Amino acid sequence: MNYKKFYKVTIERQKLARAFLSASGMGELITYIMNAIYVSASYDEFLTMKYLLARNILNCRLYPVSIPAVSEANMKSIVTTIKGTSNLIEFPSRKYNPAGVFQHTDKANQYIIIDTQFDASMDVNVLASAFNMDKADFMGRRVPIDGFGNLDNDRLAELFADDPYYVEITDAEKEALNAIPLALVDENFFMIYDNLNEFREVENGQGLYWNYFFHQWKTFSTSPFSNALLYVPATPAVTSVTVTPATATVSAGSSLALTTEVVTTGFAPQTVTYTSDNDKVTITEGGVVQIDSDATGTATITVKSTFDETKTDTVAITIS
């Protein structure tokens, strides 16, 4: 996601004159200008990062880990689960990142994004021990947020009015997101780039005031190669895998695009793998079947969920 925004603050002549009435006046004026601009810019960046995280969760791109319902009685069990998965992602695995590449995340590179209500009910020292850190080190890798689903849709719509990929998060989706207590991500999960940060000053001679503009151009993304885990008080599951067409007759040397629908619950991943039982028939990760020019006979394409390998579907292809 990208945006090019500017933030404006107006300083009237009287306010500028008052800045020279005391030794600290000019410093206070500069602080006022900076705060007025940077607070707004920081809020937009925070909101965009929350939206990116929420959209990744709703698109089932974080690996879900089931935990008990959040309650005082279940805290020990929840911390045990967090510690176990934090330990697991220190070892190379394809399991915990959307791209399915071998990846690991050391403790020092793990960050926890935590709902403030859950954070208030959790003993920080206990949670820090789950990451084998003292409290001081852990606090630097703990990012509290005011709920995973608390999003300012009006402001987001303004920020991304020209972005065709922006999709507003519904009230039902917000409710599901707010049930999530925490996520654990690699430090490289968020990819944020400052393309331009520039101040401009314009004097208005008629009104005797100055307008200060801060232009900020940013690129926001998340890395599919970074480990990212989501702790959900539910049981993630794959309900079904359905591929269409179920049968097809395809001529040698041509191709066929498959459409795969994966129904899940509990934010379980919707990714699949494709395999063919005919060496002359291959299939891309995007679901496009390619028939070699010298292929003959038939081929069966098997589509399998990466999260639950018992959930599969097949396509029977006859080569003409």
What kind of feature is each model-predicted range?
Residues T235-S320:
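Extracytoplasmic soluble-region selector
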Residues R61-F160:
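Extended, solvent-exposed, turn-rich assembly/linker loops in the middle of proteins
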Residues N2-V65, Y212:
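Long, contiguous amphipathic alpha-helices that act as assembly "spine/axial" helices in icosahedral shell
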